[in-house]
Amino acid sequence: LRQDIGEVQIDAGTVYEDVLNFVRAVMPSFENKIKLYKDEIPLFSRYQIEGQIETAFQREVMLPSCGSIVIDPTEALVSIDINSSRATKGHDIEETALQTNLEAAEEIARQLRLRDMGGLIVIDFIDMTPAKHQREVEQKMREALEIDRARVQVGKISRFGLLEMSRQRLRPSLGETRSEGGPVPVTHLPLPP
């Protein structure tokens, strides 16, 4: 538990009692943050946790604009590509690229926290001609990363549309903690805010 955690909801009575007893003994100032979840709607359904877990293992993550990001971890770095599948006929191509890149910046920051990916990360944003659009995307990326507890360094978008960044890993990445073909222990998932 940390100061920035608002509350911990537990949907099993015996587990709730065990956790509450532990917190009372070890960190009593956090006792009021432990809550028993009693709603009829299952806890994971209420907060759409299953969907977040599913996206954490997918190579491609869809964006609200129908674009997507493709995340490829390699030995040397994490490569992230942004794709716009939105039709551009009748639309301003530059505006479509900007909006998709802004959405991608937020989702990338979320996915990096969720998967706890670290090291060198190279993001291939959709090409944008105006420098002001590039600065806007860089700023959105920095803002989206502000809540990350890991140490992060973000560069500028290059003339090739690439943004380099580094992120400190806080624990083994989600892909590394996953047992081969077995279920993922939910207690180890770093859920984003």
What are these regions (language model features)?
Residues L63-P185, P193:
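Conserved glycine-centered short motifs in functionally critical loops
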